[in-house]
């Protein structure tokens, strides 16, 4: 699923066409969400459906929620009008604050707070236990899963909804990454074939899981899909020779996973050559 034309020369992986009504039935709820929030709330609903928990007020009322989210989306029309007025010398003192207060919806004026995703999930799906939001991307998502697992293993939580959402179809985001020359350009190619044209293709996606203790799952007769045993992460100074290799060698023993005993999910960016 690749789009090479809408944001040319940048390559993106677009979100498939969804019927948000299936998981967010109220149009009013949908209208006050930006795309990344609709994606996340939709994915959270799918996870609850799959776990057999949709509408179970008793469990949803105590279900914990840990979400990873970015800093929200910008209103490009407002940005463009402000910059155009400034370039023409039409920006008087207080102009910027006045335009922001008058032109942006309340949620955008609040800088699209990251925890709005968790708030919308709570409103739409009734998940009312403790809530944590980590602002960021790969590292935030890994920490969300890591902390949910740790809380369940320690007995601090029995069941948790964990996940993240991202909208990669944003001109403002592509511009930010282009400042660092991080975008994949012109045409898509698998990471193993990107030598000489490094970069990653931004994508739109939502992913949510219901994690729960074995005892809790068995008590409600739930059939598990998999067992999560370890979540590990590290930060490597990539400019230092051998840093990535040392980081991977340090993390691998902590997983305790072999080719015959489990599956491995990685948060590698897809950029060559580090992936």
PLM feature spans:
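Active-site-proximal alpha-helical scaffold in enzymes
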Residues: 40-53, 114-127, 131-166, 201-222, ...
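Glycine-/small-residue-rich "gating" segment that lines the acyl/pantetheine channel
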Residues: 86-104, 146, 150, 165-220
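Conserved beta-ketoacyl condensing-enzyme motif
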Residues: 2-125, 129, 166-168, 173, ...
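Conserved short-loop catalytic and cofactor-binding motifs
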Residues: 32, 105, 109, 132, ...
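Condensing-enzyme catalytic core mediating Claisen C-C bond formation in acyl metabolism
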Residues: 1-4, 184-266
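Active-site-adjacent elements of ketosynthase-type condensing enzymes
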Residues: 8, 12-13, 167-191, 234-247, ...
């Amino acid at each position: 699923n690749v789009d090479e034309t809408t944001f040319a020369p940048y390559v993106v992986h677009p979100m498939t066409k969804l019927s948000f009504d299936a998981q967010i039935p109220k149009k009013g709820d949908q209208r006050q969400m930006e795309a990344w929030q609709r994606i996340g709330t939709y994915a959270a609903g799918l996870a609850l459906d799959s776990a057999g928990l949709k509408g179970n007020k008793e469990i949803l009322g105590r279900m914990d929620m840990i979400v990873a989210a970015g800093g929200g989306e910008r209103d490009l029309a407002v940005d463009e009008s402000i910059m155009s007025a400034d370039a023409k010398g039409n920006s008087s003192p207080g102009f910027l604050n006045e335009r922001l207060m008058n032109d942006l919806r309340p949620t955008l004026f609040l800088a699209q707070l990251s925890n709005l995703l968790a708030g919308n999930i709570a409103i739409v799906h009734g998940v009312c236990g403790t809530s944590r939001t980590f602002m960021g991307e790969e590292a935030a998502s890994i920490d969300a899963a890591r902390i949910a697992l740790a809380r369940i293993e320690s007995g601090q939580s029995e069941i948790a909804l964990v996940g993240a959402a991202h909208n990669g179809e944003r001109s403002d985001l592509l511009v930010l990454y282009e400042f660092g020359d991080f975008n994949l350009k012109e045409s898509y190619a698998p990471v193993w074939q990107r030598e000489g044209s490094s970069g990653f293709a931004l994508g739109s996606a939502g992913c949510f899981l219901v994690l729960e203790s074995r005892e809790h799952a068995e008590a409600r007769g739930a059939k598990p899909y998999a067992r999560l045993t370890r979540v590990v992460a590290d930060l490597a100074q990539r400019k230092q020779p051998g840093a990535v290799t040392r980081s991977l060698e340090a993390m691998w023993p902590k997983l305790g996973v072999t080719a015959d005993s489990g599956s491995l999910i990685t948060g590698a960016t897809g950029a060559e050559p580090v992936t």
